[in-house]
Amino acid sequence: MRTISINDPDDPRISGFRDIRERDLTGRQGLFIAEGEVVLRTLLSDASLCRPRSVLIATNRIDGLRGLLESVSPGTPIFAAGQDVLDRIAGFPLHRGILALGEKPVARTVEAVLADLPEEAVVVAASEIGNHDNIGVLYRNAAAFGAAAVLTDDRCGDPFYRKSIRVSVGAVLRMPGAAAPSLAALIDALEAARFEVIALSPSATEPMNGLEPGGRRALLLGSEGPGLPASAMARTRTVGIPMAGGFDSLNVAVTSALGLYQLTQRQA
């Protein structure tokens, strides 16, 4: 394993890592930042759908992460910098001490992703979930419960936003995903692929615990607050989570976990 020393935060070789927070907002043209040891392990694993372009590590972390760094392919440069230089490159104190610049997978259509799935599959479908933490949690929950893909509409946040990747614990990097041009188009594609679309809503009269696992199912979730539009719920099977008096909804992280458990559990 060979590292390349960086002593100048303006070194052009690490330009992709510079001013991270500003580029979070402006975009990286097909690239993303993977932050921290756990996420980098996923990026470098065989399960990853993405590949690293370069790695940047604090010099005081090299010995502790040597095993991980040795799994980086020889053609991928590993840059090393002192903590003060690393912080100046990133534009803020970088406590995790390791970053990777990765390449997003080639974008696929929702139809193409669905065409690859088996006859029995559960997918997560999301509409108007713009919060980066929530997008990350959806991917994490989808991976944890064995869902086959995460599908979104055009009003959802980018799963390759740095914080979404971190919150997902790297699940974004290995979970198939795609975005539809609208919620209506997303439901159209699911129906055409013979998925039963199940929407979660506080207004539903059918309880979620009546759902049985099996077949092709899509768990459709909307934003916290407004939820799903009536036009979408009219096209779906709508179920709710029974709650104690005074409460009618949960956040999307908990709701998605409960829904996925219900759809993926197997009876003994």
Positions of predicted regions on the chain:
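Conserved beta-strand scaffold positions in the cores of enzyme catalytic domains, especially
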Residues: 3, 78-80, 177, 197-199, ...
